[in-house]
UniProtKB/Swiss-Prot annotation:
SUPFAM superfamilies: Ribonuclease H-like. One of its GO terms (cellular component) is ribonuclease H2 complex. Belongs to the RNase HII family. This is Ribonuclease HII. Its EC number is 3.1.26.4. Its cofactor is Mn(2+); Mg(2+). GO terms for biological process: DNA replication, removal of RNA primer; mismatch repair. Keywords: Cytoplasm, Endonuclease, Hydrolase, Manganese, Metal-binding, Nuclease. It comes from Anaplasma phagocytophilum (strain HZ).
Length: 210
């Protein structure tokens, strides 16, 4: 279970404001990448028990924790659009989303940012990257939940525009049903055309039209 050991080891003093950051949608083939930043005041987790990596939670439990996190922590979210993913790359876009999430936190100061992953996050705040951070740091685990639910809700809304791609179920990831729909209907403006499955479909469609 994630805990505060990383927050303790990297911060200086119990009054340090340590924020966890995580993103969701890195490997998706459609939709934006979404990040969340979470600060747990006074390390109060009694109201938000059993926080863990969002991938290890059932949707029902994740949604319940999401509501508690919004009520009992300081949260910020940010995203990078499909155009930004295509213009730069998914890593750069993910870090853009993370910085925006941090900027959207209602905090007067941030002493340290804990980031899930191995890459350094360049921002105005000092940061530490933690591999598998969502399994180790409770702040990052909380951020993973907020980011996941935020993006899932977003993809369910986008599903209404393009129901044939089943984004209400796959959230833009390359499931078999999504790939089949991509082959049958082609790519939408919300698909990441530089990603291999989408790029392959576009090339295949062009070859068939010749």
């Amino acid at each position: 279970m994630p805990n505060f050991s990383y927050e303790d080891s990297f911060s200086h003093g119990s009054n340090a404001i340590v924020v966890g950051v995580d993103e969701v949608g890195y490997g998706s083939i459609a939709g934006p990448v979404v990040a969340a930043a979470v600060y747990i005041p006074d390390r109060n987790v009694e109201c938000i028990p059993n926080i863990k990596d969002s991938k290890l939670l059932t949707p029902k439990k994740r949604d319940a924790l999401y509501k508690e996190l919004l009520s009992h922590t300081v949260c910020g979210t940010g995203l990078a659009s499909i155009d930004e993913i295509e213009e730069h790359n998914i890593l750069v876009a993910s870090h853009m989303a993370m910085r925006r999430a941090l900027e959207n936190l209602n905090l007067q100061r941030i002493d340290l940012v804990l980031v899930d992953g191995s890459r350094e996050l360049k921002s105005q705040w000092p940061s530490k990257s933690i591999i598998n951070g969502d399994e180790l740091s409770i702040s990052i685990a909380a951020a993973s939940i907020v980011a996941k639910v935020t993006r899932d809700n977003m993809m369910r809304e986008l599903h209404d525009q393009y129901p044939e791609y089943h984004w209400n179920k796959n959230c833009g990831y390359g499931t078999a049903a999504h790939i089949l729909a991509l082959k049958q209907h082609g790519a939408t403006p919300l698909h990441r055309k530089t990603f291999a499955p989408v790029k392959k479909c576009i090339i295949s469609t062009k070859n068939q039209d010749k």
